[in-house]
Curated annotation (Swiss-Prot):
Residues 27-46 bind DNA. Belongs to the ROK (NagC/XylR) family. The gene is xylR. It comes from the Bacteria. GO terms for biological process: D-xylose metabolic process. This is Putative xylose repressor. InterPro entries: ATPase_NBD (IPR043129), HTH_MarR-typ (IPR000835), ROK (IPR000600), ROK_cs (IPR049874), WH-like_DNA-bd_sf (IPR036388), WH_DNA-bd_sf (IPR036390). PANTHER family: BIFUNCTIONAL UDP-N-ACETYLGLUCOSAMINE 2-EPIMERASE_N-ACETYLMANNOSAMINE KINASE, ROK (REPRESSOR, ORF, KINASE) FAMILY. One of its GO terms (molecular function) is DNA binding. Keywords: Carbohydrate metabolism, DNA-binding, Repressor, Transcription, Transcription regulation, Xylose metabolism. Transcriptional repressor of xylose-utilizing enzymes.
Length: 399
């Protein structure tokens, strides 16, 4: 694609996103907001209308003269599937074209499950979603998948996902050949960051840092409207940032990684260590420790379990150190905490903020908001929906 065509597609996506953000909006207001001349906006919106992605929806108010025609995104033009392929779960949503969820499914998978079994489960849940899809003008437009690892985005190959024990898995090709639909693959934290930008209520934030805390830890960085990817597209692997020289070996083969101290896995390990040392209460004790998961610990903390509260505070403390480093490096306007950590409650958030504001040098000069995701565990799946829309519109063959 030449530069002119690329710029046209970027502007087209920018206009579509602006309409999506405002629900209904006039061409004149779009022109002011995106800093494009009225003729360009008119031509591109007319193309979007012809293609079925935008519709005219009544008239706006006018202080004098002709009332402006209002535009809105055609939510029923087609459907999108977003998938968060986690280490111990698969989370899928089927949405309309504005990200409203029509059908949703969570499927647990066993930790350490073989690649073939995980793919089999993925195909089963995809088949269920496709069967559940209602008829629309363009049908299912694409499938977006977020994966916890390093992804070569253009080819859709999972180069390395240490917590899944995957290496060089051509996931895009495998899913496309099975279902005959366009497939878009990215790192789950990048997808989560995009989900927050598009659907999380942070559309006006220029510099957003999303930190996904589950079995592993990853980060997605949004600058302007774009996810920052680095030289080869591998930026954001903050879970493998070294914060200790002498710790146990991480799943990646390194030692002292942040994941070893501040992830869901670290929380479970810490609870077991506490119980083995005799620290127990009615919720967390020798009778419950072997069967519990992170969800149980979080619920116990919300029920005022001292053991669970102490463990979550410790995790927040260590995660805060990692995030303080990221704040110093990237200087974001906001840090959004997602995935499992978004359910950890006020105690977790208060301690996390305390550490970030104490240790991040730049917070003396620039206030950085630290928030939990309003999307909770849907940031990645909705980000995958946004990824399908944005990647699809980046190429002229999508219609």
């Amino acid at each position: 694609m030449g530069n002119h065509a690329l710029i046209k597609q970027i502007n087209k996506l920018l206009i579509l996103k602006t309409i999506l953000d405002h629900r209904t909006i006039s061409r004149a207001k779009i022109s002011k907001l995106v800093d494009l001349n009225k003729a360009t906006v008119s031509n591109l919106t007319d193309e979007l209308i012809k293609e079925g992605f935008v519709i005219e929806k009544g008239y706006g108010h006018s202080k004098g003269g002709r009332r402006p025609v209002l535009l809105e995104v055609n939510k029923n033009v087609g459907l999108i599937i977003g998938i968060d392929l986690g280490v111990n779960y698969i989370h899928l949503v089927l949405t309309n074209f504005i990200g409203e969820i029509i059908w949703e499914r969570n499927m647990a998978i066993k930790l350490g499950e073989k690649q073939e079994k995980i793919l089999e489960s993925l195909f089963i849940i995809l088949e269920e979603a496709i069967k559940a899809a209602p008829p629309t003008q363009k049908g299912i437009l694409g499938i977006g998948i977020g994966v916890p690892g390093i992804v070569e985005k253009n080819s859709g190959t999972v180069l390395l996902a240490p917590n899944l024990k995957w290496q060089d898995v051509p996931l895009k090709r495998m899913v496309e050949s099975r279902f005959g639909l366009p497939v878009y693959i990215d790192n789950e934290a990048n997808a989560g960051a995009l989900g927050e930008k598009w659907f999380g209520g942070w559309g006006d934030v220029s510099h957003l840092l999303y930190v996904s805390v589950g079995i592993g830890i990853g980060a997605g960085i949004v600058i302007g409207e774009e996810v920052y990817r680095g030289a080869k597209g591998f930026a954001g692997e903050v879970g493998h940032m070294t914060i200790d020289f002498n710790d146990d070996v991480c799943s990646c083969g390194n030692v002292g990684c942040l994941e070893n101290f501040a992830s869901e896995r670290a929380l479970l390990s810490l609870i077991k260590t506490l119980v083995e040392s005799g620290v127990e209460d009615e919720y967390i004790n020798r009778d419950t420790v072997e069967e519990m998961d992170a969800g149980y610990i979080i619920q116990s903390a919300l029920q005022r379990s001292r053991v669970a509260m102490n463990a979550i505070t410790d995790i927040a403390n260590k995660l805060g150190i990692g995030i303080a480093n990221l704040v110093n490096i990237f200087n974001p306007d906001i840090v959004v905490i997602g995935n499992k950590a978004s359910f950890m409650g006020d105690l977790f958030l208060e301690e996390l903020r305390r550490i970030v504001y104490k240790r991040a040098f730049i917070t003396q000069y620039h206030h950085v908001r630290v928030e939990v995701s309003k999307l909770k565990d849907r940031a990645c799946v909705l980000g995958c929906v946004a990824m399908v829309i944005s990647d699809m519109l980046a190429f002229p063959d999508y219609v």
